[in-house]
Every structure is written in structure tokens, then in C-alpha cells.
């Protein structure tokens, strides 16, 4: 998978890790605000992933719901979909699918945070340039 497949301008059907166009719209092109939102997402995603470790259904559902909003805010569509799936699994009481849904959210979050980390190290780069 190329960097352009993973990162950058993605549509909802073929999303990148972060939808650069969506992020730019959400921040009105303000690179400082963009950086701040990305930093908040990285910190918040770590906290959220810690909350889902205990397998308390109410905490997992609340954490997944929070992650959905955070991910949508920056255009991290894969993370949002993984969090939606986790929330659905918890709401349905499907304990057999819980571990798989948690693993999918962790994987999508790690992928997004890696791309964001590369962007934060070199702010002149767009996420589509980060591999």
C-alpha cells in the first residue's frame, strides 16, 4: 500500500488515514489549529484505548462513542468506522466479537497516530507526504 493509499485526501469509500481535505475544511486552513487538533487527537486516542482495556461494557461504549467524534473531527474515517463497529458490538452484547472490534480500533488508531506523529515532527509536510 502506497503512502497515497494510506494518507491524504481520501473519500469515505477509499479513505486515507487522515482526510487532508476534510481536516483543512475543519480548520479553515489554519495550520496552527490543525496541529493543535492532531495533538489533541493523539492524546485523546491513547486515553480512550486505555479505557477499553478493562472490558467494562459501559466504559467501552462511552470510549468508542468519544473516539467516533474525535476521529470524524480530523477526518480519520477508518478510526471512526472501527469505533462505530466497537460501539455496535457492545450495544448488541456480542462478546464473541468484542476482542476483534477492540483490535481493529487499536490498529486503526495506531495507523492514524503514526501518520500524525510524522506530520507533527515536520509541520511543513502534509499528512499525504508522511509514510
Describe the predicted segments one by one:
Residues 1-15, 121-130:
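Intrinsically disordered or compositionally simple regulatory linkers and C-terminal tails
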Residues 18-66, 73, 97-120:
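Long, amphipathic alpha-helical coiled-coil segments characteristic
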Residues 71, 89-90:
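Eukaryotic all-alpha helical interaction scaffolds
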Residues 71-73, 83:
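Mid-chain, well-packed structural core segment of small domains
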